Amino acid sequence: MFNKIFCPIDGSETSSHCLTEAIKIAKAHRSRLMILHIVDDFYPFLDGLEIANLAEIEKELRKNGEKLLKKAAERASSEGIKTESKLVEVLSKKIPTVLLEEADKWGADLIIIGTHGRRGINHLMLGSNTENLIRISSIPVLTIRHKQ
């Protein structure tokens, strides 16, 4: 039923659990899996830091994102899943918009995402990025709540 499953991850426990579920579903449907990590515009949180430090921080965020993707892709591949991974840098667009654009571009027929990520104040039931993705997506979205 699902040929291409798109799973964004952010390094949180919720996204790790989400990846586990995406792997299970991909195995059951013999689907391909795209794992995506976003390095986003974090400048509002860095008020007062020197510009020289920003380049180092960006470099470290990319490096950490690449490590996260490599580990996630190895995890999925070890389960026999055909896996692709992608690191995307977001500077001006909203994360849900970028997620949907990337899922569309790849031809995903299911998006699997955690209910809450690493940043921001949690809304009542869903994280803001997940909630907004659900609102704008033409692709079915399966939300995974963190196992507690």
Which stretches of residues belong to each language-model region?
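Aromatic/hydrophobic pocket-lining residues that form π-stacking "cages" and hydrophobic walls in ligand
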Residues: 22, 72, 99, 133
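A short acidic, glycine-rich active-site loop
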Residues: 53-67
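Short glycine/serine/threonine/alanine-rich loop segments
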Residues: 31-32, 81, 108, 139
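Residue-level recognition of beta-strand->loop/alpha-helix junctions
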Residues: 37, 87-89, 145
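Short, well-ordered secondary-structure micro-motifs
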Residues: 18, 45-47, 96-98, 123-125
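Gly/Ser-rich helix-loop-strand patches that form or flank binding pockets
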Residues: 24, 104-148
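Structural beta-alpha unit
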Residues: 74-111
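Small/aliphatic-rich secondary-structure junction motif
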Residues: 3-52, 75-77, 84
